[in-house]
């Protein structure tokens, strides 16, 4: 679904975003994909593997969620602190807000990894698919509204100085909606971190990453 929507939206992006800015958009999205792989650390696969063990499901759910939440939070805080130097390094010195949004997107997406895995493990494919589709549709609605209906003055007040920022912002809104929709599952997480289990998961997950 997300790939289909991206394919449909590409003509809109090409029409409203100049070539140089579109290259920035593409490069940053490639970077987001790479960072998401690193931050997930293969723990989605490890979650399925160790949850299948007898009496291990809750411990695996809690331990894997807290590890990914902590890792993603450390990444987010680091990027927010060193936002401008990072923006300078990647050539976004005039638009450091892109790097901030990128960090928030990565944080929210990785916070959702284990809850999404929980839905699949519990045999709830309809709920899993519904959340994914709602995210994609909401993201599409936001970006189309920004390009076609919302006045430029209003979007600029939200920090979107250029039209290339519209896809980034809409992606952030989609990721935020995902976290909200998954919040009932996130609230099931208990304050539990099993060290021995974590190291077993880490040993299993690292080659997968």
Question: Language-model segments: which ranges?
Answer:
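Alpha-helical transmembrane segments of multi-pass membrane transporters/permeases
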Residues: 1, 58-62, 68, 99-105, ...
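Signature of the first transmembrane helix
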Residues: 1-44, 71-80, 105, 140, ...
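Hydrophobic residues within alpha-helical transmembrane segments
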Residues: 28-31, 66-70, 104, 130-138, ...
């Amino acid at each position: 679904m997300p790939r289909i929507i991206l394919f449909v939206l590409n003509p809109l992006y090409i029409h409203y975003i100049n070539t140089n800015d579109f290259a920035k958009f593409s490069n940053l999205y490639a970077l987001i994909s790479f960072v998401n792989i690193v931050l997930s650390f293969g723990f989605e696969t490890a979650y399925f593997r160790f949850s299948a063990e007898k009496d291990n499901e809750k411990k695996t759910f809690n331990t894997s969620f807290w590890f990914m939440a902590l890792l993603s939070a450390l990444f987010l805080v680091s990027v927010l602190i060193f936002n401008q130097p990072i923006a300078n390094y990647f050539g976004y010195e005039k638009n450091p807000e892109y790097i901030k949004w990128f960090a928030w997107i990565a944080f929210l997406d990785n916070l959702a990894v284990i809850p999404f895995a929980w839905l699949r493990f519990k045999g709830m494919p309809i709920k899993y698919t519904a959340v994914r589709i709602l995210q994609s549709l909401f993201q599409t609605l936001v970006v189309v509204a920004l390009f076609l209906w919302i006045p430029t003055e209003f979007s600029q007040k939200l920090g979107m100085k250029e039209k290339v920022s519209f896809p980034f912002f809409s992606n952030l809104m989609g990721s935020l909606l995902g976290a909200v929709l998954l919040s009932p599952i996130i609230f099931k997480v208990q304050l539990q971190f099993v060290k021995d289990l974590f190291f077993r998961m880490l040993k299993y997950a690292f080659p997968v990453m």
